[in-house]
């Protein structure tokens, strides 16, 4: 697995052996960040199911200002910390070794706000649980990108999130959302996504 583009583009990322952690494929990461374009520049990123850090590291490589990575699996956590260190990203990266909800609560208490959330939870985790607590750390207008198995049901509407676009890449689907819409906008959001 390599970083696709940016300041550390082409560099190899460590990944734990086995099938527990599945880093986002390079072509999917490329498509995700191509869609976001300049929206990544200078932003704060939260990666609450970081695994080896492929998504958040790609964001940092493409100009994100800072990233918080959250991971609990020991092998993935070791790979994540080594990736951040090997790529010289320590000054802009923070790694929290705790469950996602606990980390989000901690960040909310600290007053942290993020303009980009990269959500790639274990496929078995229910969506309501995967997004639980996320709104507490999102800045108004934040992008939320959710990766899931394309065969699974699409994420249900979540208060404050307005769907923008979905895109399928083989067995993976990405859903792009914007945060900070009022309830009326959110309720009317069904016809807003442009599916490509």
What is the predicted function of each stretch?
Residues 1-196:
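Class I S-adenosyl-L-methionine-dependent methyltransferase catalytic core
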